[in-house]
Amino acid sequence: SKIYIDKTNALNQIKVLQKIFNNIVGNSRLPMLVIDSKNDNLNRNNFNASAAAVSGFSMFANEVVYLLDKDGNIDYVNLNNFLNKHSKSKFLVFGFTYNIFLNLINQLKINKLSQKNFSKAFLIHGGGWKKIEKQKIKRGTFNELLNKKLNIKNVINYYGLVEQIGSIFFECKCGYFIASNFSEIIIRDENFKECKDGESGIIQLISLLPTSYPGHNILTEDVGEIVKNHNCTCYGYGKRFLIHGRLKDAELRGCSNI
């Protein structure tokens, strides 16, 4: 199947993403380290979810450097040049969750780094949890491993559809995903009736933004719950919600293998 996004819709999606993102990281463009291979993302014949996500978030960058070489190995020359230039001020690290787990947590050799402190980094990641959960790695453990190895404190997960970058939901420091003014979330039970707050069910995503394709109202195969009683004072006043995974027997696919 194909999703057609015209110029007007694409611009609206970008404007909204920028507004949401700026509330979290700030208004300035920042250098960005992408945990992926440049070759994979420039190949338009194989333009997948990873390439689309990198393309969308690259607009917040004033420089983009890729961690992996054409063979998928860590390019320490590129990485050290990037760290020597940018590690003393705020910078972005972006990638799919599994790529970050595989390359930064598992394979990166600290003794090959010229600068070992990533404390100024804002690490943005999303998708790919299915592969990690098989290894019993949860959000808290994932963040702790990044902090312990690279001193990364600002780890921000996101949830959404790759074709609707303006309807993205970022995870706050309290561990909740937050709906923006341009999107909404409803939780439904197995009979598609609306769940009460705190009850787990099927996630329904609603967005104001799609104009060139029918993406306003989508019933996903993801499971989550809306959190009513919380003390979260993070950015935005939208609904707080949690993601619990996929429906039982749902097709095991996601951004890590699209």
Residue ranges and their predicted role:
Residues 1-12:
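Conserved AMP-binding A3 loop
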Residues 9, 29-40:
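Short, glycine/charge-rich beta-strand/loop segments that flank catalytic centers
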Residues 10-20, 77:
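Short acidic (Asp/Glu) patches
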